[in-house]
Amino acid sequence: MLYNSTQNAAEVVSAAQAIAQGISKDGGLFVPQEFPKYSAETFNELLKLDYKGRAKKVFADFLSDFTEEEINDCVENAYTKEKFGSDNPAPLAYAKLNGKELNILELWHGPTCAFKA
């Protein structure tokens, strides 16, 4: 999969280049040229997996220049109980607001207390 800069679509890089570079030369962010399309069947299969399993599947689709082994190693080393305080890096919390049930995905766990992939 290839990635373009949000500031200049002519700047095209691989996933590995986008990760290593971080931000494009023109200050833009890298975004995929295309997004994988998931069927209902694929979504149902993802539901059967834990967080790490889902991450491995999605990363494999977006990071096509990495091997399965590289992705597995990265996921296993990134989402550890020691780093997140739990085996589930992004737990769901449940709440009610004005009589409506809400599902809240907690993305602040982990060393950065910020966004998770």
Locate each region found by the language model.
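PLP-dependent amino-acid enzyme catalytic core
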Residues: 1-117
